Structure formats: structure tokens, C-alpha cells
Amino acid sequence: TVGEGRCNLSLGTSGTLFISSGKFGVDAHNALHSFDHADGGYHLMGCMLSAASCNKWWMDEILKTTEYAREQEKIKNLGENRVFFLPYLMGERSPHNDPDARAMFLGMSMDTTREDMTQAVLEGVAFGLRDSLEVARSLGIRIERSKICGGGAKSPLWKKILAAVLNLKLDLIESEEGPGYGGAILAAVGCGEYESVQAACEKLVHVVDTVEPEPVLVEKYEARYQEF
């Protein structure tokens, strides 16, 4: 992911937003990390410590099931869940920088279902990623779409939620192993196969599917995010 305002979302154990930028971006609270690339340009990074690992904890340790897809198939009313999940199982890095932050469910009632809580976990991670995205936007960085990779990207439902919460088009790339693939691309540039990282990415990174944010869900999730 190279080029002004381009973004990559890695939805693995942790959740990381990598945002390409032509300028060094630091906010007043150091909420995001900013790095200088060897051949020019910068990237901002927002990293939440627990992302897909929140879902793994919920499914494996609490529900005691490995049927991830089956559990998610039961979720129907997106954007209407009254339960919130704060995804801070290991403290939090970006943008809060608080090792003492802790996870919790909020808003449960006698009507709360298993599906509501599963949905809340997926949404809570999406809201946590939105926190970092909002910091980048406050720095004047305009982002309209992002590539997505990592184990969590295998879930169609989660991608749909993320697209709506972030209000971004999400491009799924051909290779699921984003970090390894990126390392190979950098090696190809270093060996002289391509004149720049951007040229290599344009040639080697192939989008196989795009999830568009649905306007109705964007509106519903905007209200939910403001509550979060």
C-alpha cells in the first residue's frame, strides 16, 4: 500500500492501520506512530493490541466452539445491536496508549442473546480501529479505501461491518499473507527488479474482491460509533 492517502488494514491478532502519506504526521497526543521510509515518504500506523484475538477469545474460551462462520451466520440486524464490547483485553496501544485499559461488555439486558454478544465483539474491534482512523483524518489525511488482509479478513460479515464503520471501500488482495508478501516486494525493489516500491505494488498487488460500504449501514454505525 503506497501512495498518498492509501491505507492497509491488517486484521490479525492485533489490528493495524498502515496509512501512506507524503508528510510526517504527528498529533498532539502521539496517538499514532509515524515512520520515514528509506526511499522517501512516510507511513502512519495505528495499532490496537487485540483485534481478531478478541474474536478468538470469545469463540474459543467463552463459547467453546470453533464454528466461527456458523456463529456469525446467526447475526442479522447489523447496526441495531444495543450491546457494546470494549476490545481492550491486553490494554490498548493506538490511539489511547493505556496499558491499564480493560475489556468489557456494556448495555446487556434480559433480552441480550448469544448472537448480540458475538456481534458486539466484531463491532467493538471495528470501532477501535475507527478511533485510529479518526486521528489520521484529524491530521488532514483523506482516505477513501483500504486494502485488508489477515485472518479476520476471511469473514464476509466482519468485512461488511468494517466497511460501514470506517466508511471505506475494502479491497481484498490475492495473497492473504500481507507482511510476507510486502517483504518480498521490498526485496524485489532492492534487487533492482522494479524502480520503486510504488511501481512494484502496482504490478504485483492484485485486488480480487471489494467490499463497498452500504449507505444505510454507514448511517446506523455512525450513530453507534458516536455512542462508543
Predicted regions and their residues:
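Active-site core segments that coordinate phosphate-bearing ligands/cofactors
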Residues: 1-227
